[in-house]
């Protein structure tokens, strides 16, 4: 098997038709479309009689983990956020060998594994790539001011405050 091809996420646009104008105008929405990542898997059963049961077991494992992170060993430190998983038809190549395709529907961005870690509020993480949409979990009591990309937010916290910028 070979490493899968990873598609580039497409920008989303509003299409504007103006009467009397050649062509259309496009306005960026500031969002990306989901990307499908297709991976071909194969498996070898110990016994030909176990072939179908082995595939059912593999399907259960994929479907149990239908969301989460998709990482590749040749691109350490990064992952894709999986939104759904579709499992294709199991092809029997030989009595004990099966092959099937899994399509992972992922968000259009790649994420740093380091960015998913909890950090102290005084820490700064510089993202040299795409715009990020972090989740802030702030614990404590009192007034807190959070500045992100030049935008300042002040909140009175009484225990715990969660700010999810991906919503």
Predicted segment positions?
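Solvent-exposed edge beta-strands and adjacent loop segments
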Residues: 1-36, 76-90
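Oligomerization/assembly interface segments of phage tail-like spikes and tubes
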Residues: 24-49, 96-109
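Generic structural detector for well-ordered beta-strands
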Residues: 42, 71, 103-105, 137, ...
């Amino acid at each position: 098997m070979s490493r899968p091809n990873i598609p580039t996420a497409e920008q989303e646009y509003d299409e504007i038709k103006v009467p009397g104008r050649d062509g259309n105008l496009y306005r960026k929405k500031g969002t990306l479309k989901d990307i499908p990542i297709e991976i071909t898997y194969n498996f070898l059963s110990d016994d030909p009689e176990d072939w179908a049961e082995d595939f059912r077991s593999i399907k259960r494992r994929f479907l149990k983990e239908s969301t989460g992170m998709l990482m590749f060993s040749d691109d350490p430190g990064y992952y894709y956020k999986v939104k759904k998983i579709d499992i294709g038809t199991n092809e029997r190549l030989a009595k004990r060998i099966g092959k099937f395709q899994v399509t992972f529907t992922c968000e259009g961005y790649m994420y740093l594994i380091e960015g998913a870690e909890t950090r102290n509020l005084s820490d700064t993480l510089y993202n040299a790539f795409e715009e990020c949409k972090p989740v802030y979990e702030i614990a404590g009591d009192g007034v807190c001011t959070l500045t992100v990309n030049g935008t300042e937010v002040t909140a009175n916290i009484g225990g715990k405050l969660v700010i999810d910028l991906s919503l």
